[in-house]
Swiss-Prot record:
Pathway: Glycolipid biosynthesis; lipid IV(A) biosynthesis; lipid IV(A) from (3R)-3-hydroxytetradecanoyl-[acyl-carrier-protein] and UDP-N-acetyl-alpha-D-glucosamine: step 1/6. One of its GO terms (cellular component) is membrane. Homotrimer. The lineage of its organism: Bacteria, Pseudomonadati, Pseudomonadota, Gammaproteobacteria, Pseudomonadales. Keywords: Acyltransferase, Cytoplasm, Lipid A biosynthesis, Lipid biosynthesis, Lipid metabolism, Repeat, Transferase. InterPro entries: Acetyltransf_C (IPR029098), Acetyltransf_C_sf (IPR037157), Hexapep (IPR001451), Hexapep_transf_CS (IPR018357), Lipid_A_LpxA (IPR010137), Trimer_LpxA-like_sf (IPR011004). It catalyses: a (3R)-hydroxyacyl-[ACP] + UDP-N-acetyl-alpha-D-glucosamine = a UDP-3-O-[(3R)-3-hydroxyacyl]-N-acetyl-alpha-D-glucosamine + holo-[ACP]. This is Acyl-[acyl-carrier-protein]--UDP-N-acetylglucosamine O-acyltransferase. One of its GO terms (biological process) is lipid A biosynthetic process. It comes from Pseudomonas paraeruginosa (strain DSM 24068 / PA7). It is an enzyme of class 2 (transferase). GO terms for molecular function: acyl-[acyl-carrier-protein]-UDP-N-acetylglucosamine O-acyltransferase activity. Pfam families: Acetyltransf_11 (PF13720), Hexapep (PF00132).
Length: 258
């Protein structure tokens, strides 16, 4: 029994593993590669060059690998690369890159991208991230591992969302979000750290306490960023988690959410 519905359209140049399932009315375009165990639902459009790894599931009405609407894009060959064990729910849109940046949009492993979310061109999504319904990432956005963006979160182009961070529903993010920080509002403001997420992921009580102190240094003591970074140096040398927090602030290119 074929795992590809006869009503699906598969370009001859597409490469599908033997056990890939494709539902009715879906279109798998030229230069699309799909790894083993992946399930493509009905009414999905996949456009290449796109590489999709193993054991992913893409639900109905999603558009994956479409050209970017960036006005600079003139049809140059660009890519979308998706890793393994991702779930892409209904109506998600993901665009390929532009040659002005990386020429590639990249999604890692074990991510949940919920209904009607959008991932813009040249964005990079790490591993174990959750993009809740209607989250929209502009172009060139980086989302680090274990970040959670709640429903209707909007992220400005070139922003970086730090590892283990959390955004509240409807947040409008225009600056970098440091690792572990919880933000909320329009415009988004730092509210606390994602301590619940840390506990669920097995962070030690010592590391959480050190991060709590580090947060106060940056956000509660009136320091400039440079002063806060200097004060965090000793703690960062002792706790890798604080080093990640400090590095995410130091490397911010758009300023940090305060």
């Amino acid at each position: 029994m074929s795992l590809i519905d006869p009503r699906a359209i598969i370009d001859p140049s597409a490469r599908l593993a033997a056990d890939v399932q494709v539902g009715p009315w879906s279109i798998v375009g030229a230069e699309v590669e799909i790894g083993e165990g992946t399930v493509i639902g009905p009414h999905v459009v996949l456009k290449g060059p796109t590489k999709i790894g193993k054991h992913n599931r893409i639900y109905q009405f999603s558009s994956v690998g479409e050209d970017t609407p960036d006005l600079k894009y003139k049809g140059e060959p660009t890519r979308l690369v998706i890793g393994d064990h991702n779930v892409i729910r209904e109506g998600v849109t993901i665009h390929r890159g532009t040659v002005q940046d990386r020429a590639e949009t990249t999604i890692g492993d074990h991510n949940l991208i919920m209904a009607y979310a959008h991932i813009g061109h040249d964005s990079v999504i790490g591993n174990h991230c959750i993009l809740v319904n209607n989250t929209a990432l502009a172009g060139h956005v980086h989302v680090d591992d274990w970040a959670i963006l709640s429903g209707y979160t909007l992220v400005h182009q070139y922003c970086r969302i730090g590892a283990h961070s959390f955004s509240g529903m409807g947040s409008a993010i225009g600056k970098d979000v440091p690792a572990y920080v919880t933000v909320f509002g329009n415009p988004a403001e730092a509210r606390s750290m994602n301590f619940e997420g840390m506990r669920r992921r097995g962070f030690s009580s010592e590391a959480i306490h050190a991060l709590r102190r580090a947060y106060k240094v940056v956000y509660r003591q009136g320091h400039t960023v440079e002063e806060a970074l200097a004060e965090l140096a000793e703690s960062a040398a002792q706790f890798p988690e604080v080093a990640v927090f400090r590095d995410s602030i130091q490397s911010a290119t758009r300023g940090i959410t305060r």
